Amino acid sequence: KKGDAKHIRLEFCNQRSTPAEIRMGYAYQSDIDFSEAKRLAAKADLVVFCAGLDGSIELEGRDRPFDLPYGQDMLIQELVKVNPKLIVAIHAGGGINMTRWIDQVPAVVHALYPGQEGGHALAHILSGKVNPSAKLPFTIEKRWEDSPACGHYDETRKEKKVYYTEGIFTGYRGYDQKGIEPLFPFG
């Protein structure tokens, strides 16, 4: 029942040489109430929405999702309905699925992980004080299935080896060779 305390018992045996670790999480409901965020966005001159991943999702030794977590896609779609002057600042170490809302927002800045002065840097870019040159250091695909890495992240595979058979056709060259149009190309 909602609101009642839950008792959870976790037992496991670590049989590898790597440190033991247990991760717990939760899932957001699809009926999240965005009314307060929408109310504030509706009366703003401009909305800068910082979306992305955090250290619990994107870290060394783990695969991270291509989709934005925690209902961020839904929130972006709701905010742009009430204020079309919406800038989405993405904080992630690579590409993110933007196809659910990219055609509705006027601007996206892929800020990567900018560090402690990232807020100032983003403000300087958005105000026009600094020109970021609009160059991406990687290609952002439209779909995860378009990524050259996609086939290597199947947890059901028994063999966990990656064979680099693409030769020089990595990154943007691979997209060109296969005729895949990315969402945002390298450079």
Question: Language-model features: where?
Answer:
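C-terminal non-catalytic regions of proteins with extracellular/luminal or membrane-system context
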Residues: K1-G187
